[in-house]
């Protein structure tokens, strides 16, 4: 009986790890979505984008533009003593 219980505990732990790995981030760039074989979006016909680690078709409106301007240093941090 103890061996069966231990087997099920190990099986549960292994399956939990597999679920965690499959639910994690699947992309870091838009190109990753193409390489893993995500099909074109049905509504737009465009390729999905990578948004927060997931390939997404409806996220393009929510994507924040990359800022190219740098924030000037504040006076308190730019002083040399």
UniProtKB/Swiss-Prot annotation:
State where the protein is found: Secreted
Keyword Disulfide bond present in the record's keywords: the answer is: yes
UniProt keywords (A-Z) are: Antimicrobial, Disulfide bond, Fungicide, Plant defense, Secreted, Signal
Q: What does the entry list under GO cellular component? A: extracellular region
Recorded superkingdom: Eukaryota
GO biological processes: defense response to fungus; killing of cells of another organism
Which cysteine-cysteine pairs are annotated as disulfide bonds in the entry? 27-50, 33-57, 41-59
Which residues does UniProt assign to the signal peptide?
1-24
* UniProt record similarity statement: Belongs to the DEFL family.
Quote the protein name from its UniProt record: Defensin-like protein 311
